[in-house]
């Protein structure tokens, strides 16, 4: 069941779980995790979404009732681009959008612009990932649908950005509001529990992008239930 998700209609905050290329994050195991997210989303009326492998986009989009994002799209048109991820193919898959410029899949400025432009043409949402306040401020000028600030040194760590560098969230939100207050700012890196989520939202964030804290957990349902208490 392919779903649509509109920022203004369906509201915020949102938690986006990036399945990355973890052993637990693809195929049947990844699907089972997303099914847990779907159940929690419905039971507790919260916005949960997943960023998944390109290989799993069609299966997950067809069979889940949560928004599915790609982890990466290339800002290309039809043609000779072997190995690239075509925006039209992602749209066809049923995914609603994509991460752009994740710290583990960084892009140059020209490619970021091209990707956001192509996604806009096709109605795909973009979550532009940035590393710091200056990058977030610059990224806001491209008018992505969402910005997600993640200091790379904290990604996958035990200390949340909202604890280690709260000023990054606060100042990023302030910078974006001066350029386009309609762009929600998410945050990520080290987010593990409801206290991290609550602190992030108190600093002006409108959502969370996280990965290992959920995907690598032996009890993802328990972790997700805890996380949504912070929304």
Predicted regions and their residues:
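Catalytic cores of alpha/beta
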Residues: 131-143, 187-206
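General beta-strand structural signal in soluble alpha/beta enzymes
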Residues: 50-52, 68-70, 99-100, 128-129, ...
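A structural motif corresponding to the C-terminal end of an alpha-helix
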Residues: 40-44, 94, 175-183
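Glycine-rich phosphate-binding active-site loops on the catalytic face of alpha/beta enzymes
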Residues: 96-107, 146-159, 201-223
């Amino acid at each position: 069941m392919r779903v649509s998700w509109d920022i203004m209609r369906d509201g915020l905050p949102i938690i986006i779980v990036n399945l990355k290329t973890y052993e637990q994050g693809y195929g049947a195991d990844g699907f089972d995790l997303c099914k847990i997210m779907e159940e929690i989303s419905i039971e507790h009326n919260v916005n949960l979404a997943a960023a998944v492998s390109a290989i799993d986009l069609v299966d997950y989009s067809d069979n889940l009732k949560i928004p599915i994002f790609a982890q990466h799209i290339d800002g290309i048109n039809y043609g000779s681009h072997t190995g690239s991820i075509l925006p039209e193919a992602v749209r066809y898959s049923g995914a609603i959008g994509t991460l752009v410029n994740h710290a583990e899949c960084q892009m140059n400025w020209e490619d970021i612009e091209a990707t956001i432009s192509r996604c806009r043409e096709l109605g795909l949402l973009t979550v532009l990932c940035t590393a710091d306040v200056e990058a977030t401020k610059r990224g806001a000028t491209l008018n992505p649908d969402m910005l997600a600030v993640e200091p790379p040194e904290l990604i996958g760590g035990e200390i949340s950005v909202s604890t280690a560098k709260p000023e990054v969230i606060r100042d990023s939100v302030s910078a974006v509001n001066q350029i386009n207050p309609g762009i929600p700012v998410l945050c990520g890196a080290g987010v593990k529990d409801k206290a991290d989520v609550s602190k992030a939202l108190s600093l002006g964030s409108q959502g969370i992008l996280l990965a290992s804290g959920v995907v690598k957990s032996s009890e993802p349902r328990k972790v997700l239930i805890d996380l949504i208490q912070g929304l």
